[in-house]
A protein has these predicted regions:
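Transmembrane beta-barrel wall of Gram-negative outer-membrane proteins
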Residues: 1-24, 28-67, 106-115
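Short, intrinsically disordered, charge-balanced linker/junction segments flanking boundaries
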Residues: 5, 324, 329-332
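Membrane-embedded beta-strand positions of outer-membrane beta-barrel proteins
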Residues: 15-19, 55-57, 123-125, 236-238, ...
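Short, cationic motifs built from Arg/Lys/His that form the positively charged side of catalytic pockets
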Residues: 16, 40, 315, 330-332
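Short acidic-glycine motifs
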Residues: 16, 107, 217, 254-255
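Acidic/polar loop-and-plug regions of large Gram-negative outer-membrane beta-barrel proteins
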Residues: 44-46, 52-112, 133-210, 275-295
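Outer-membrane beta-barrel transmembrane strands
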Residues: 93-136, 203-249, 297-326
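Glycine- and small hydrophobic-enriched segments that form the cores of compact globular domains
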Residues: 248-309, 313-319
Length: 332
């Protein structure tokens, strides 16, 4: 961590900044890592004995690989409870399918008015914005890519030759059976036949998506305080909040494929593929072109909608001491 603060200068200005990082690699749980940075900067101007204005900015861009729970059968096979099915080897490196990444910086502006030695007014506003995503494997029609899928475990083939072979493979991690086979996922995608409906290229049936909850959060806070001559005190204020959160899924990595067809695979399965209208995610695109959209890296797909919050709150509090006793009244 590196921090510096100037203190109050003769011209009324003061400023401070700080930067830091936190790094973590493979430890008890394979495939889990932590890369985070933090920053803070603030500047304040004291115009005179009554008026002060301060601006602050802070944030912490972070990326971390996640662990996922498995079954007791798998923990027994690998010999510990630290097993993580989210990762596999690709080009000699550990690659985790589930990664949490976020960066939501906050900007704050604060004004202080010392009206007199008994009264003060504070007005502050802040904005928080940025991205918050969580990646995961998804697939369409092909074999389940999760290494600990129940059909890939010995118990599914109990008391059979296949079950015995799987048991030995899991015990010895033969061909990295405990991990995601990234090479195979690339091979499956690149082996798909081209479909002229969606243009040139291979349709990905395995990919990594990233599910987002991206916020814009605005707050306004005002507070007035006054001390009466009998030392009783009154505080009051008004708080306003406006939040808009966009929820959507994004194509993060096509794993060697060229596009992903944006349909609801569960609705398509349940409807038997009979009426394509019933399993479209984007009806506007379907109505215009007559087929599902072929989305590529960075495109939104599956769902995209907003959640909105508007809050307003006013409050007041009165307090007074009578010797060893005190009275407090408040409401909002």
């Amino acid at each position: 961590m590196l921090t510096y603060a100037s203190g109050l200068q003769d011209n009324g200005w003061s400023y401070a900044f700080s930067v830091s990082t936190r790094q973590g690699g493979n430890s008890y749980v394979n495939g889990v890592y932590y890369n985070a940075f933090g920053y803070f900067a603030a500047v304040e101007k004291q115009f005179n004995s009554q008026h002060r204005l301060a601006l602050s900015i802070l944030g912490a861009p972070t990326e971390r690989g996640a662990q996922q729970a498995s079954t007791q059968e798998v923990y027994d096979l690998v010999g510990n409870n630290y097993y993580n099915p989210n990762w596999g080897w690709l080009n000699g490196k550990r690659v985790n399918a589930r990664v949490r990444s976020y960066h939501e910086p906050i900007t704050m502006l604060n004004y202080t008015f010392d009206i007199n030695d008994r009264s003060q007014l504070n007005v502050a506003t802040s904005v928080r914005f940025g991205q918050n995503g969580y990646s995961a494997l998804t697939w369409y029609g092909g074999p389940d890519p999760r290494p600990d899928y129940y059909r890939y475990l010995p118990s599914f083939y109990n008391n059979t030759y296949v079950g015995a072979q799987l048991y030995e493979a899991w015990m010895g991690n033969t061909n990295n059976i405990r991990h995601i086979n990234w090479d195979n996922l690339y091979h499956i995608n690149q082996s798909q036949e081209e479909n002229p409906t969606y243009g040139a290229g291979h349709r990905a049936i395995n990919m990594i998506e990233e599910r987002h909850a991206d916020q814009i959060d605005w707050n306004l806070y005002t507070q007035f305080s006054h001390i009466f001559r009998d030392n009783s005190k009154i505080n009051g204020g008004l708080n306003l909040r406006r939040n808009r959160t966009e929820y959507y899924s994004e194509v993060k990595d096509l794993l060697g494929g060229d596009y992903w067809v944006d349909v609801d695979k569960f609705a398509e399965r349940d409807m038997g593929g009979m009426n394509p209208i019933l399993y479209q995610n984007n009806m506007e695109y379907y109505d215009k072109y007559g087929h599902a959209q072929a989305v590529k890296k960075g495109d939104k797909y599956s769902y995209d909608y907003y959640g909105n919050i508007i809050n307003a709150r006013a409050w007041a509090q009165y307090s007074r001491n009578f010797g060893n006793f005190g009275v407090n009244l408040g409401g909002e």
